[in-house]
Amino acid sequence: MENKVLFTDSVVANFCKATVDDNPIHDPEFMYSQNKGVVVPGMLLFSTIVNLLHRKTKEYFNYYKLIFGNVICTNEPIDLGFETKGEQNYLYAINGHDMFSTKNDRSVVMRNIEYKEFHPDGIVRTMPFHKTQLETFRELTNSFNNTLSDFLFTIAYASAALFKAIREPITEVETEINRLLNKAINPDQVSPFYQTLEIFRVNQHAELKFEGIIEYKIRFDREKANKTYVAQVACVHNNQCFYQSVYRLVAIPDKLIMRMVKDR
């Protein structure tokens, strides 16, 4: 099932405000100054598709695997949807190329998948939120219901928690990533890019209060120094675990990221 969708600059700006996403590739003013299009956040695309999937199937899914293979810009029509093959629901966002696939793998949503064993340690980063953020998020992602929307919001908000950990490092690995991404220190000018994200939904009934704190227990591990890292994240609110997730991040040159983005 697919929809033709077009995301405007204002939608992206409001989504980033709600999720505290300050990545400059989503900033119209900055990107236009570079004669580049504005990149639509992957979590905006993902959340929109998942709402569509749940609205169509009315099923509960506990496993989400995202593959990030491309970027999509605002003000361009996108084929957005999912393709069901047996127990697997493949997600896609296509505008010439699919954002959610590579030559070797595709983003998929499934149910009844066993959880992985997670490291019990990690450092908790707290992220405050308020009602306006949730309402904006629900509106922009065409929310199916509040419970699903809260789950998706906590995923989108996790990016801000990860970058908070990097900007305010505590562990040796966090300090290493901080130095790598600090453009005042590292002349190579690199930025983090998600390669994959696996999410194991723990509680299908967990909901956010109107305002409060979301706790993200984060553990960074080095896969290849100054290149590739893995982050394990557990998301908790009001003593309820929403999900556990595994990110694989790679540091790539800013120039390469900009080459992936269409010219205006």
Could you describe each region identified by the protein language model?
Residues 1-38, 110-172:
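Catalytic strand-loop segment that frames the active site of acyl-thioester-processing enzymes
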